[in-house]
Structure formats: structure tokens, C-alpha cells
Amino acid sequence: YAIMETGLGGRLDSVSICTPVISVITSISLDHAEILGDTLSKITKEKVGIIKPMVPCVTINSHPDEVQTIIENECMKKKSPLIITTNSKQLLYTIGLKGNVQRENARIAELVIKTLNPTFNETYIKQGLKNVKWYGRNQIVQKQPLVIFDVAHNESGIASFINFYQLLAKGKKILIISLQSRKKINSQINAILNTFD
């Protein structure tokens, strides 16, 4: 298998010319709003373009209702089985990545594997999730003093990073951040100001 990630939405993304064996929709946020639309509904309508007829779609269970409804409707329209992660905060495996969003991603990965191959050896899933590394996401570069590197660049990514950071940080908290001027992080400004010195 090859995993192909859309770079921009789904409907107009070059990846959409491929016929997948499974489609995955992770969390949806106001990213690329200048191209995809300025609301979650508009962005979701673009993202669901990755769903293909009769091809299973895996997604998370924590979408806002408006987003979930659009995904469900698209799957029904295309007769695509919709597989949604469980609500459980407990993950059956230890994962090598830190943060709540990574547990959510691990649930998605597990569902994808089990959908494609229901008899896949659980030991391999367990080992893979335990040993996975994702540089640039909640990456602890140094422990004393604590230095974390993260490439978060949208509101949901920044919220996830702050959530992770607050679990570990003690003492003086310094943030070095660089964003393109077109990035809209207004909803995270207060969280940033309240978290860092």
C-alpha cells in the first residue's frame, strides 16, 4: 500500500485522481481558508471530495456536528461505508507519540489496518505504534531545559501543541513562533498569551 496525503482539501487535490482502497478524514479546521472556504462547512465540503464511491472512509468521532453530518451525507451519497473511531479515551496500545491528537491518529491507523486486513497480526500493530516517531510534532528535543519542536500552523494544531506543552512545562515558558501572514490563529491568541511568558 501507499499512503497519499492531500495537501489541500480533497475535491481539487491532485491525490483525488487516484482510486484509493480506503479514504481517511482526520480532524478538520480552518486551514487554507482562502482557497477552501471560510467556514468549517465549506472546508468539509471540499475535504469530502476525497471520498470515492463504494470505498470505505475512516474518520474520527470528535468532529463538530455540522462536519460529521456532511461526511455522513457524502458517504451515503457515494455508498461508501463510514467507519468512525470509538469514543474511548483508552488506547489498547502504547504509542511512541505524545499528545491526545496522536492517540486519535493511532485509533485511525488501527481502524484502517483492521478494515483492509481483518486478520492482520495485532502484535505488528502494537509494535508499530510503540516505535513510531514523527519529527516536528510534539518533538522533545531537549529535556533540561525543556525544548519542544512543533510545526503546528493552524488553530487546531496550535491548540493540540498547547495542550501537550501544558502537561510538561514548568518554570519560565518561552515560545518562538513564525507563521505566514495569511494564517488565521485568532482563536488561539489568548491561549498562547496565557500559556507563555
Task: Describe the role of every protein-language-model region.
Residues 87:
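A conserved short coil-to-beta-strand element within the FAD-binding core of flavoproteins
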Residues 1-6, 12-24, 28-29, 42, ...:
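Nucleotide phosphate-binding/pyrophosphate-handling subdomain across enzymes
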